[in-house]
Structures are given as structure tokens and as C-alpha cells.
Amino acid sequence: MAELACFCYPHLENDSYKFIPFNSLAIKCMLTAKVDKKDQDKFYNSIIYGIAPPPQFKKRYNTNDNSRGMNYETSMFNKVAVLICEALNSIKVTQSDVANVLSKVVSVRHLENLVLRRENHQDVLFHSRDLLLKSVLIAIGHSKEIETTATAEGGEIVFQNAAFTMWKLTYLEHELMPILDQNFVEYKITVNEDKPLSESHIKELIAELRWQYNKFAVITHGKGHYRVVKYSSVANHADRVYATFKSNSKNGGMIEFNLLDQRIIWQNWYAFTSSMKQGNTLETCKKLLFQKMKRESNPFKGLSTDRKMDEVSQIGI
């Protein structure tokens, strides 16, 4: 995750702003600079290489002292920064909006995936600039639309029906912020269209998840799509979701946290997010993740007989 101010800076033109991507040498200069505390939140002028991000964001970049940040000297950093600028320059950002826009925390990996989709000549985003920019504006939280299959970050499609598409996320192969744990496995499920779904299509998805992904929990980050994650990573997701929810609540103007379909979501996660929305503490909410829940009656009669027992997947073992 990183603020948009880590990728670009605003330049006032008439009554709105044009956004310009940082170059890696300007960032490198900022990372070595001594800056007064009162100037930590201001864009840094490297004199030689142009404007650099505010020094308060130093930890967002990979250095000898911090291996958890972005690999800003890669070509992918420049591609992501340029893509963000293209999207921001396609809309009007006024002086009253600019600080709020640049403070938005975004998923670096999501944006890298959109670059990869853009470069794939078989992908619809390669052929449609409007759809590409729409996808980026959704990714950076500047649109109230949800991420659907067409505007999704992408990955490897492992399941699809008339209503849903399930993607295996490819973060292990990333340049900018790769996942270093080689055991990482995670999926995302997007709706093909933002409209009411038929019961039969929901039933197909639940059957697929129950039999092929029975070692995983289905959760949501509240943005209109599902995530399918290892049970061992659920607590980590809970910390991130709670922190983001609280931050958005504090800053105001947040998009409503979408609990999604209770029949698809893991029961304990639904309890966690419901408790979070009620304003309870992180400790209180997280207790629900490890509490034994009363099993719900099967919402779809006959679902358990859709697959034979010998078809149960070994994925995740």
C-alpha cells in the first residue's frame, strides 16, 4: 500500500491540476536528504532531477534499511506512476480536492496488475483507453463504482460462470512489490456486472468454493468483490481491513463497506465485519474470527450432493 503522493505531484494549470510522475533519481535524492521536521510533509525539490515525494513517505520505498517498500528503480514503478497520472489528468482536480486525492492509500499490486493488463494485447484494457482509465479510477478510490470483471486488477482466471469470475492473484511474479512468501496463494472473485444475481449462479459459485477451495476462507474487504484466502492469513486481513475502515471513517466521505452475500462469505468473517461496522474495538471484533459459530442451515437444498466426495480438491493442502 502507498499514498498517491508517492507516485506523482500536482502542477497548477489555470483552475485545475495536472499530475506529473516522479522519476527514480529524484526519489533517490530525497531518500538521502536531511530535511527539517516542519518540511517532512512537503514535496521535495531535488534541484537536479526535479520534484520528489514528501520525505514523510520514505518508508514506502525499498532501501538498504527498509526492504518492505516499493522497488522504485524498476521500469514498473514508472509505468504505474504514468498510469496514475493518465487517470488523474482525465478528470478535473481542483485546489480544494488535491490534498485529499494525493493522500489516498492505494494497492500498489493492484496497479501493477492493471499495467500488465494494459500491456496484454489479448486483454480488453489494451484496446479500450476509456475502460482502462475507469479501472484505474476505481483502483485509486476516485470512483464509487465497484471493481467488476472488466475493470478488475486481473490475474489467472480459474473459474467463471454467467455471474462471477474467480482470479488467482499473481503477486509472486511482480516487480514493484512482489510477495516474498513462496507459499502465498490467494484468489479474488469479481461480479461480471453490477446487477442482481440469479440464485442458480450463486449456487454454482458456492459449490465450486465448497469442493475446490475447501481449505480457504471467503472474505471481503468491503469493496464489492470477494477474496479467497488461507485461514492462516485471515487475522492479518482483519487487521488491515479494520485499520482501513477506521481511517476512512475518520477522514469522512467513505464509500459504504459492502458486506456482500452472507451465503458466500465465511460465517466468522461476516460476524467480524458486522461487528466492525457497529463500532466495536478490534479486539472485540477479532474474537469472532476464532469463535465456534452455529452452522447455518443450508441456504441451497441439494448443494452438498452436487459433487462426489472423490472430487474434493487438494488445493491448499
From Swiss-Prot:
First-listed, main subcellular location of the protein, grouped into a coarse class: host cell
GO cellular component: host cell cytoplasm
GO terms of molecular function: ATP binding; metal ion binding; nucleoside diphosphate kinase activity; ribonucleoside triphosphate phosphatase activity; RNA binding
Cofactor: Mg(2+)
Highest taxon in the source lineage: Viruses
Keyword Metal-binding: yes
Keyword entries, A-Z: ATP-binding, Host cytoplasm, Hydrolase, Magnesium, Metal-binding, Nucleotide-binding, RNA-binding
Residue span of region RNA-binding: 205-241
Record-linked Pfam families: Rota_NS35_C, Rota_NS35_N
Enzyme class, broadest EC rank: hydrolase
SUPFAM superfamilies hit by this protein: Rotavirus NSP2 fragment, C-terminal domain, Rotavirus NSP2 fragment, N-terminal domain
Active-site positions on this chain: 225
GO BP term, pick one: viral genome replication
HAMAP family: ROTA_NSP2
Protein name: Non-structural protein 2
